[in-house]
Amino acid sequence: MVSLKLQKRLASSVLKCGKRKVWLDPNEGSDISMANSRQNIRKLVKDGFIIRKPTKIHSRSRARQLNIAKRKGRHSGYGKRKGTREARLPTKVLWMRRMRVLRRLLKKYRETKKIDRHMYHDMYMKVKGNVFKNKRVLMESIHKSKAEKAREKTLSDQFEAKRAKNKASRERKHARREERLAKGPGGDIPAAAPPAQTAEVPAKKSKK
């Protein structure tokens, strides 16, 4: 049998595919073996002696079904696992994910003025120190801290108001004292009222 390696190589170049995709008609081997140029190969392709094989379809439907099941937690038991827990999902990757989530939340709260820069820095350092397990715990801590700060501010305002009131009272007392001292030792003693004249009551006549 005549070797058709040259014709197969030229046909793959003309058809722009691999040599495995080229089909040569076994009944026309003598005519195909005479073709030694790309022009002759094109003529044979036109005549149907050389054909490009169709692409084989490799269905992914089963793979898609398996992926959907794995997202639900199926096929993930101990028997399906290859590698240690650290190899499958490193703790460093988990740490990075958690840090990014918590820091993103802190940045969002700072930009929307929900927290000031001092609280942002305090919470940022606590996040770095592994104080918060997840986003919910961080949000609860922020709300608790804000409530505590508001309570302290209310108490401080009440204390300041009380101090101001006491100070004003002391100033009034001091002013009254200075006023009394300025008037002199007996200046503020009221003059004695004249004695009231007693009306003479007529004596009752005794009955005889």
Swiss-Prot record:
GO terms for molecular function: mRNA binding; structural constituent of ribosome. Residues 164-175 have a biased composition (Basic residues). Pfam families: Ribosomal_L19e, Ribosomal_L19e_C. Residues 144-163 have a biased composition (Basic and acidic residues). GO terms for cellular component: cytosol; cytosolic large ribosomal subunit; cytosolic ribosome. Residues 144-208 are annotated as: Disordered. The keyword Ribosomal protein applies. SMART domains: Ribosomal_L19e. SUPFAM superfamilies: Ribosomal protein L19 (L19e) (SSF48140). It comes from the Eukaryota. InterPro entries: 60S_ribosomal_eL19_sf, Ribosomal_eL19, Ribosomal_eL19_CS, Ribosomal_eL19_dom, Ribosomal_eL19_dom1, Ribosomal_eL19_euk. The keyword Ribosomal protein applies. GO terms for biological process: translation. Keywords: Ribonucleoprotein, Ribosomal protein. Belongs to the eukaryotic ribosomal protein eL19 family. This is Large ribosomal subunit protein eL19y. It comes from Arabidopsis thaliana.
